[in-house]
A protein has these predicted regions:
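Hydrophobic alpha-helical transmembrane bundles of multi-pass membrane proteins
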Residues: 1-404
Length: 404
């Protein structure tokens, strides 16, 4: 009887992992639609090619080496197949690999409209094989940071990846954007920012809702169990808090944009939703629903401030606001954890955040610089004018009407 109960719990937890992983996988569609809606028509097919390509690269490279680097267990499939203690090892791998793809997807939008496609893919290989798995091994994997110190000894806590996944992706994106430079025509001779409008806001809105839905798998799956009353209650609370934070982010971003700009900016509302989701990801397990709403609301305000600051003050061109959503708000998410979790300290979160940022930013910067020196990372001015759909992919997403 006891063995039958164990087998039932094992099957339920494995199935739960797979379903949550499938929800996270669907976030790839969300990123694709969001980015396709926020770039110009002449660059749509290329951004979609980036997204499906990076997902395939992440799945392959993490299987070959990244998963072993992050968690150990032997190279290739030896560390993936077989029975775990409470669920299948393969279900754990599947859940983890879609997180890797999510982190890499963040980079795609930030470098949109002017990066060479295969230079991006080359970076994706290194990021998903080494850069992300190594920082993941220091956090969720429990390894020491180059043998110097252990984040677990400090008490660093990141429930589902505000820092480990989102801030890491934003750090890699920032390094790339700094070397890549802004899009042609983004800033005038005086350095003033000129708006470059996205082509399809309905598509961007659809992408945001897909991401919102997928986030329930992202955070809910990170409870790591479902087959007991306690774990089922925990998953339900994480779902509620995730939803509440996203709602808080939308409301705060909309109100703040209305006060600041005099208009209810849809793109800020969309980024507000994502900011709320990123903010709660580090600690959706401890706050009440109301506190989760407030954490998301702070994220919604921060993302509006950050997007404007990066664009107008720092002149860092991020077409979709990815660095602000996932980087700045990812940091806020880490720092918000001690507000509701008394076992976590601000100092631990700061050490963890600095470790993630410094490693990913420096390592990514070196890879981007090497790619720039060897094969180049930016398309020519003429290719940028024509649109990377034609120059990189040889086709157009909207062949009957393309506005250049």
């Amino acid at each position: 009887m006891e063995n039958q109960i164990f087998e039932l719990q094992y099957a339920l937890d494995t199935f739960y992992f797979l379903v949550m992983g499938a929800l996270v996988m669907w976030m790839a569609a969300g990123f694709s639609m969001l980015e396709a809606g926020l770039v110009r028509t002449k660059n749509t097919a290329e951004i979609l090619t980036k997204n499906i390509g990076l997902f395939a690269i992440a799945c392959t490279m993490y299987m070959i080496y990244g998963y072993d680097l992050m968690y150990g267990g032997g190279a290739l499939l030896s560390g993936i197949s077989g029975q775990g203690e409470t669920y299948s090892n393969a279900s754990d791998f599947y859940f983890q690999v879609v997180f890797v793809a999510t982190s890499m997807s963040i980079v795609s939008g930030a470098v949109a409209e002017r990066m060479k496609l295969f230079s991006f893919f080359a970076f994706a290989v290194i990021f998903t094989t080494i850069i992300y798995p190594l920082e993941g091994s220091w956090t969720w994997g429990g390894a020491s940071v180059f043998g110097l110190y252990s984040l677990s000894d400090f008490g660093f806590y990141d429930f589902a990846g505000s820092g480990i996944v989102h801030m890491a992706g934003a750090s890699a994106a920032l390094a790339g954007v700094l070397l890549l430079g802004p899009r042609k025509g983004k800033y005038d001779e005086a350095g003033n920012s000129k708006p470059i409008l996205g082509a399809n806001l309905p598509l961007a809105t659809l992408g945001t809702f897909i991401l919102w839905m997928g986030w329930f798998g992202f955070n809910g799956g990170s409870v790591l169990a479902m087959a007991s009353k306690e774990s089922a209650d925990a998953v339900a609370m994480v779902f509620v808090n995730t939803n509440a934070a996203a709602a808080g982010g939308v409301i705060a971003a909309l109100l703040f944009a209305k006060i600041w700009f005099g208009k209810a900016d849809l793109t800020m509302a969309l980024n507000g939703a994502l900011a709320g989701l990123v903010a709660i990801t580090a600690g959706p397990d401890t706050p009440s629903a109301l506190v989760a709403t407030l954490i998301g609301a702070v994220g919604g305000i921060l993302v509006v401030l950050s997007i404007v600051w990066f664009d107008r003050k720092l002149r860092i061109d991020d077409p979709v606001g990815a660095i602000s959503v996932h980087g700045v708000v990812g940091l806020w998410g880490l720092l918000a954890v001690p507000l509701t979790n008394s076992d976590v300290t601000f100092s631990a979160q700061i050490v963890g955040a600095l470790t993630i940022f410094v490693w990913v930013f420096v390592a990514s910067g070196l890879v981007w610089y090497a790619l720039k020196s060897i094969i180049g990372i930016r398309v020519s001015a003429e290719e940028e004018d024509d649109g990377v759909d034609l120059t990189e992919c040889g086709l157009e997403a909207y062949p009957e009407f393309v506005s250049k």
